[in-house]
């Protein structure tokens, strides 16, 4: 199974790339959406979050005020680490279920038994055979590097744009103040470091057509080497 780990900076255009991949028939798992599910009504994680912060993060109707929660965690690294410790295990489990279901489906369609890759060829957290019944899937994980999940992907794609575009897009997308935008950007690894560690870099500073061409080229070229690289040293999926 060819597993694309799609990441980048906040507001650089990961979702746009994900939509392009879906147009190519590639299943995409959205870690951000899974994180939102972790805080859904009735979730034990939501209850722990409400217990910690109380009415400060509740709307008058009793709903979770996600913007207020964001203001708290993006202003305090310790609080952000606590929240991530609640949510990340749930997201990891959801991603593993996504991969397992696709691998099982592929084995039924193609009649190829599921086999683990040799230890020297697999990255931790996945490890499904890349033989006849292999397929391409995408895990869109904004915090792929920060959460030490590099080893979940057979190749890592990083989406970039200019700093000015990044801030403009965030301002258009969310009702954030300039200070809140800077806090969100600062909470992640520098984009230059993500680019340095990427297998594929997609420049989203131009037109949609230009981005689509880059994605098409990456699909054609990078797909020749699934699981070719050993796990990156110094990281685990924990």
From Swiss-Prot:
Pathway: Cofactor biosynthesis; coenzyme A biosynthesis; CoA from (R)-pantothenate: step 5/5. The keyword Transcription does not apply. It catalyses: 3'-dephospho-CoA + ATP = ADP + CoA + H(+). CDD domains: DPCK. Gene3D superfamilies: P-loop containing nucleotide triphosphate hydrolases. Residues 110-129, 219-238 are annotated as: Disordered. It is found in: Cytoplasm. One of its GO terms (biological process) is coenzyme A biosynthetic process. InterPro entries: Depp_CoAkinase (IPR001977), P-loop_NTPase (IPR027417). The keyword Transferase applies. ATP binds at residues 11-16. Residues 3-233 form the DPCK domain. One of its GO terms (cellular component) is cytoplasm. Belongs to the CoaE family. NCBIfam families: dephospho-CoA kinase. HAMAP family: Dephospho_CoA_kinase (MF_00376). This is Dephospho-CoA kinase. It comes from Synechococcus sp. (strain JA-2-3B'a(2-13)). The lineage of its organism: Bacteria, Bacillati, Cyanobacteriota, Cyanophyceae, Synechococcales.
